């Protein structure tokens, strides 16, 4: 997967939060997105993943322009925000199947078990999300992403 950001900008009223940022990430690259609080990291990630409309510029994921093909972009990229929005009354397996069905992603029992194993949730998979530690809740969010 490649990501290309060109002159991406976002304003909240008169405050410029992201100002013409440009970068590209090639398939297979691992990068860190660092900066002080309020620097625009989360805002930039929300624009790249299609959860927030940019005021200027463009972001492409796998050659797909985010604001034009928002749903297709979301099917190509997972995003786990710091404040992980989970339905805590659901069981882990139930939640993963639910999220998959919302995004039209394969939710066979075999696929869900594969994801559970990959993120290290095997021993927690039969529990309600409300019973999990913060770390395991993050893993559920990662599995859902």
Task: Please identify what each model-predicted range represents.
Residues 3, 10-145:
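ABC transporter nucleotide-binding domains
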């Amino acid at each position: 997967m490649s990501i290309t950001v060109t002159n991406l900008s976002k304003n909240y009223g008169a405050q410029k939060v992201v100002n013409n940022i440009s970068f590209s990430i090639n398939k297979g690259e691992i990068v860190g997105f660092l900066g002080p609080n309020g620097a625009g990291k989360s805002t930039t990630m929300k624009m790249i993943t299609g959860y927030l409309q940019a005021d200027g510029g463009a972001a492409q994921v796998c050659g797909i322009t985010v604001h034009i093909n928002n749903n297709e972009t979301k099917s190509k990229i997972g995003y786990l925000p710091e404040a992980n929005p989970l339905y805590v009354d659901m069981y882990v397996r139930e939640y993963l199947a639910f999220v998959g069905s919302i995004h039209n992603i394969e939710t066979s029992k075999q696929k869900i078990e594969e994801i559970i194993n990959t993120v290290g949730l095997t021993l927690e998979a039969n529990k309600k999300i409300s019973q999990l530690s913060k770390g395991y809740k993050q893993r559920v969010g990662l599995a859902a992403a």
